A protein has these predicted regions:
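Structural signature of Gram-negative outer-membrane beta-barrels, strongest in the C-terminal barrel
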Residues: 235-241, 346-349, 355, 361, ...
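Acidic, small-polar-rich N-terminal luminal/periplasmic segments of exported/outer-membrane proteins
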Residues: 36-171, 544
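Outer-membrane beta-barrel translocator/receptor signature
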Residues: 120-121, 136-141, 146-230, 241-242, ...
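C-terminal beta-signal and adjacent terminal beta-strands/loops
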Residues: 565, 675-692, 724-775
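N-terminal Sec signal peptide and the immediately downstream disordered periplasmic leader
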Residues: 1-81, 195, 240, 296, ...
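Gram-negative outer-membrane beta-barrel transporters
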Residues: 347, 356-357, 422, 426, ...
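Membrane-embedded beta-barrel scaffold of Gram-negative outer-membrane proteins
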Residues: 291-318, 495, 501-513, 517-518, ...
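Solvent-exposed loop segments that connect transmembrane elements
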Residues: 218, 256-278, 317-331, 372-402, ...
Length: 775
């Protein structure tokens, strides 16, 4: 079954991992003197448990280690987690959340239409808040749950869950932590966190983070980025069994990476042009978030309430080349999206023959965004623009579009586990969701510009320009969609020994439906809109796994095999464009099946030597291409690949660290990592875009080259090296690293627009050093 991956077991042993290579803590390297692997406690199933005792495929990354290794971004945090892919997100297009493009086991998010974000296939939580933001600093740990988690986590947990847990305040302990990093491209990254007790029942923790980089590729402003974040948490614990944590956070993500990046050859050579520098920042996200977490232990049960409100504002800028063959600046922005999440759950205390959990959840989102395209001049971007006849005067507006809408989701859920015997347990869970959504899309079109791209005249000039009288303004009515969904989980687990667990599970997940709209040109040249209602996508998972500790707790072997039946996998495929260049979409819906495995081994060879090998295999294939509803056009017309793009068929990570204990008790840790990724394509394209030799059909000069040639990357391996020093009590730490030793560059993301393949490259070789101080 797995031979199609083309990867033997012996080959896996030669493959490797990722991440900046810096010193780990003494305990993470087994240097604490215990000589055994440490226990890791998580709340993945809404209870506090040892991760080795949970019958599910889970990975954990500790915040202290990630900070010491300089791994700050979501991509870096998750880069060595098996079968997890963080897709490229163009700045200013982060789908209401900077973490909105995570795929687990091949389950990718719905492609957006015309700037409208689609639902995420991975549920991201920050401090128990769904779609929370700001979890990448002052981080305690990250939990990654692979496989559908619909019963406990609900909407968007089709592929799995990524849960960020930041540090809570601590009573009766004053502490300060400072992290700093400097690296290639003037990278400056720093975090400060202060824990301040305010009596026996009250404590506050304040954390601030800043991350700035000039980027690696473009001149002038190039891909400069800047991140500024802050959070304050207040802990109130008047009773031993009552705990209240309230939090407020704010952040600003700014980037100048919205300029044009054009792949000029199909061999990987990439030409980069800057976008206009008159708009600053070119892309940015801004958020504020407020949350409260209250838990009360009754003795026989624990009641938990989690409530949050947050807003998200986004703007973006991009330069493209479009009809009528003149450069275009696209400016996008959103009014603050408003999010409201409320959850109440009651769970039995562990230890009984029957453990249970019941809960209710409410989630709402109100959103609005606009996008405007104007002609771009040479004075703004050099060779990418046309001659500016009147310096200082903006080019004409070509078109603008936008959307606004609201979404509400109501849910009830429950899960019970019954101990049939001391070593045999059965679990059943269920969840019911009801979603209500409305959306209005509006569209303005203007071709009243002359050969210099400046606005001239009124709508009467349209006939002279196009030969056809066209109206100037188009609008659309509401699209509405209501969905109800039921998900379930059935699982059996058996303890072969106290350190060896075997489990089998059938579970379901769903990706929420969505109401979107697309331009729909009519025969007379006018444009109306058609509704593109995405149905709910349902996935049924069959999984068998095992978790093991052997050799006196020095070797850990975890693994799982899975089969997914994914009915109605949907994507918005571009079929053409309006006279102004606005894209026109249809929805494709095809059956998909995923087959794969996760494997993770950690071996404490000696108290000073740790070796980690993990691997992920997934074969994500479209099994058939039915005709589009109401047509005789096969959906393969709009889907060039049978294998889902952006999902590597194989990844593997190999990590080795050795701890030297010096005479004064300090620790020196050299570390080496290697990460292997199988080749493939990163974005979906149509059959026409995948055709060579047809003028105007595909990409490149003359649009004669298959867009797929620009997008494909071969297998690659990234090697990272690092060296870290830790003081005897862990108060001080110094680290140095080299990432991507071989300077391997590949296309990380591709945006195809009007035959122009805009490519975004991966990071080159980088160097850096970091420090931390804790007292």
């Amino acid at each position: 079954m797995l031979r199609s991956f083309g990867l033997s077991a012996s080959a896996l042993l030669a493959l490797g991992a990722t991440g900046p290579l810096l010193a780990q803590s003494a305990e993470s390297n087994g240097a604490s003197g215990s000589g055994v692997l440490e226990e890791v406690v998580v709340t993945a199933e809404r209870r506090t448990e040892d991760v080795q005792k949970i019958p599910a495929s889970i990975d954990v990354r500790q915040g202290t280690e990630l900070a010491e290794q300089g791994r700050i971004s979501t991509t870096q945090i998750l880069e060595d987690v098996p079968n997890v892919t963080v897709g490229f997100i163009q700045p200013g297009q982060s789908a209401d959340n900077p973490n909105g493009n995570i795929a687990i086991r091949g389950v990718a998010s719905t492609q957006q239409t015309g700037g409208r974000p689609g639902p995420s296939s991975t549920a991201v939580y920050v401090d128990d808040v769904y779609q929370g933001i700001g979890g990448d600093f002052d981080l305690n740990h990250v939990e990654v749950l692979r496989g559908p988690q619909g019963t406990l986590y609900g909407r968007s947990a089709t592929g799995g869950v990524v849960a960020f847990h930041t540090n809570d305040p601590v009573l009766d302990k004053f502490s300060t932590e400072v992290y700093g990093e400097y690296g290639t491209a003037d990278l400056r990254n720093g975090t400060v966190a202060i824990n301040l007790p305010l009596g026996d029942e009250l404590a506050v923790r304040i954390a601030a983070h800043e991350d700035d980089s000039h980027g690696y590729w473009w001149n002038v402003d190039g891909d400069t980025t800047s991140i500024k974040e802050a959070r304050i948490k207040l802990l109130y614990q008047p009773l031993e069994n009552l705990k209240v944590v309230v939090s407020a956070s704010s952040g600003l993500y700014s980037s100048f990476a919205g300029g044009q990046a054009q792949a000029t050859t199909a061999t990987g050579a990439i030409n980069f042009n800057n976008g206009s520098t008159t708009i600053a920042p070119i892309a940015g996200d801004q958020y504020t978030q407020y949350s409260a977490n209250v838990s009360y232990d009754f003795g026989a049960a624990n009641l938990t309430y989690v409530g949050s409100m947050h807003s998200f504002y986004q703007n973006g800028f991009e330069g493209i080349v479009g009809p009528p063959f003149m450069p275009i600046n696209t400016i996008g922005g959103s009014s603050p999206d408003q999010f409201n999440s409320q959850e109440l759950r009651l769970a039995s205390d562990p230890g009984g023959k029957l453990s249970w959990l019941v809960g209710a959840n409410f989630y709402s989102n109100i959103y609005r965004a606009t996008q405007t395209s104007i002609v771009q001049y040479a004075s703004e971007c050099g060779p990418c623009g046309i001659t500016d006849p009147t310096p200082g005067v903006d080019g004409g507006e070509i078109f603008s579009n936008g959307f606004q809408g609201s979404l509400k989701d109501y849910a009830l859920f429950t899960e019970e586990t019954y101990s049939v015997a001391d070593n045999l347990r059965l679990t059943a869970g269920a969840r019911f969701d009801r979603q209500e959504q409305t959306q209005l899309t509006f569209y303005n079109f203007n071709v009243n510009y002359d050969q210099y791209g400046q606005n001239v005249g009124t709508c009467s000039n349209l006939e002279a320009v196009t030969g056809t009288p066209l109206p100037c303004v188009y609008s659309a009515s509401n699209a509405t969609a209501n969905y109800s969904n039921f998900t379930y989980k059935v699982r059996g687990e058996f303890d072969l020994t106290p350190s060896n667990l075997l489990y089998a599970m059938v579970s379901t997940g769903y990706l929420p439906g969505d109401a979107q709209l697309s331009p729909d040109p009519l025969a007379d040249g006018s444009v109306t809109f058609k509704a593109l209602n995405f149905s709910q996508e349902r996935l049924t998972s069959f999984e068998i796994g095992s978790k093991n500790r052997v050799f006196n707790d020095t070797l850990q072997l975890n693994g799982a095999v899975f089969y997914y039946d994914y009915s109605g996998y949907q994507q918005a495929a571009q079929t053409g464009q309006t006279p102004s260049g606005a894209p026109i979409f249809v929805i494709t819906a095809v059956p998909v099946r995923m087959i794969g495995l996760d494997f993770d081994a950690t071996w404490l060879l000696t108290p000073a030597d740790r070796l980690t090998l993990n691997a992920g295999l997934v074969d994500a294939q479209i099994t058939s291409f039915p005709d589009l509803p109401g047509t005789t056009t096969p959906e393969s017309t709009y889907l060039a690949y049978s294998r889902l793009p952006g999902i590597p068929s194989a990844t593997a990570n190999l990590i080795y660290a050795h701890t030297f204990t010096l005479g004064n008790g300090s620790i020196l840790t050299p570390r080496a990592e290697a990460r292997y990724v199988a080749g493939g394509n990163s974005v979906e394209i149509t059959q026409l875009q995948n055709t060579s030799g047809v003028a105007g059909a595909a990409c490149g000069p003359g649009q004669l080259t298959s867009c797929g040639d620009y997008d494909y990357h071969s297998d690659y391996t990234i090697v990272n090296l690092g060296l870290g020093w830790l003081s005897p009590k862990g108060t001080y730490g110094l680290n140095a690293y080299v990432r991507n030793v071989g300077d391997t560059i590949y296309v990380e993301g591709l945006n195809i627009n009007h035959g122009n393949a805009q490519a975004y490259p991966s990071e080159p070789r980088t160097y850096g050093a970091s420090f931390h101080v804790k007292f």
